Amino acid sequence: VFPRHIVLYRKPAPMTQALPLQGRKILIIATDGFEQSELEVPHERLTEEGADVKIASLEGGDICGWDDGDWGEDVTADLTIAAANAADYDALVLPGGQINPDMLRTDSDAIALIQAFAAAGKPIAAICHAPWLLIEAGLTKGRRITSFESIETDVKNSGATFVDESVVVDGNLITSRCPDD
């Protein structure tokens, strides 16, 4: 499972100490327009904690981030979303940005993959605008969710309770407002 005690900016454990996520496999799904820090920081921190982190995208290959109002750096995906199997991973991370989740929520493979993680009770972390994907997957009704403020109405309209906190954990769903929190 995805430990709740991870703090994004904690100093990495010394190499002589067992890493908290050693042996865990985490999947990040993204496409062009992902918020740069919302993919790179979780990838870096999870890797530092010992997790084997893979990135899946719509077409595989390079995807381009969005950083401070302009196109950012490319990141290379390890596999396509269609080739990813929830059974192979322990948790799922959904970076936000406006473009990334808006494109992914219209992709049936992406939504089916998110639903498969949920059906297995595996942790799903959704950052910023990524709760749009949870809404599209039908996972928010009756749940406590946070998100970037501009999609608060979407969260409420999906039947979720919007919580204005930096991070909200409700069962297997972990949501956060934005990278600045």
Language-model region placement:
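A short beta-strand/loop micro-motif in the catalytic core of glycosyltransferases
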Residues: 124-125, 145
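Short hydrophobic/aromatic-enriched beta-strand-loop microsegments
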Residues: 141-149, 163-165
